[in-house]
Amino acid sequence: EWRDEQKHMANPLDDLRIKAIRPLVPSACLIEDAPADAEVYDTVSSTRTALSKAVRGEDDRIVVIVGPTATHECKATMEFARKLSAMAESLKADLIVVMRVGMGPHGDWAGMIFDPDLNGSIKINKGLLQARQLLIDINRLGLPVACEYIDTISPQF
């Protein structure tokens, strides 16, 4: 009777507990859908240079990485980013402020990239686009971001 239930499958041992398989959008397509502009590239580039100098001791400013452990609400995250950006600007002579944006799993939640709708639907393509757009929007404020990636796929997007 077990074999009768599995006749529709090419190999009755493959994917026994898989409900659906959906393709992952290629990173090139996502980058095209949410392009970063020159302002974003300037923020990233100048911050990398400043951080490199700070690590080498050529810049005496203190590096501060601050932000939410788990980001799931873009509107609230942008509100925090705007306030932090203003504060970072006023303290830029003494501090290099980088906003932490945690989009990976936290506690029992899969994270923004894997569960952008907060309902267990696992819409990874939507999450990747939403996460990329959020990072772009924060960088457009002139506020650099730091992310902790827990897989080898997410950084490509």
Segment roles from a protein language model:
Residues H8-D14, A81-R82, M87-E89, A93-F157:
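Active-site-facing alpha/beta catalytic cores
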Residues T43-R61, A76-S90, V97:
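Generic N-terminal targeting/processing segments that precede catalytic cores or assembly contacts
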Residues E1-H8:
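Short, Lys/Arg-enriched N-terminal segments with co-localized hydrophobic residues
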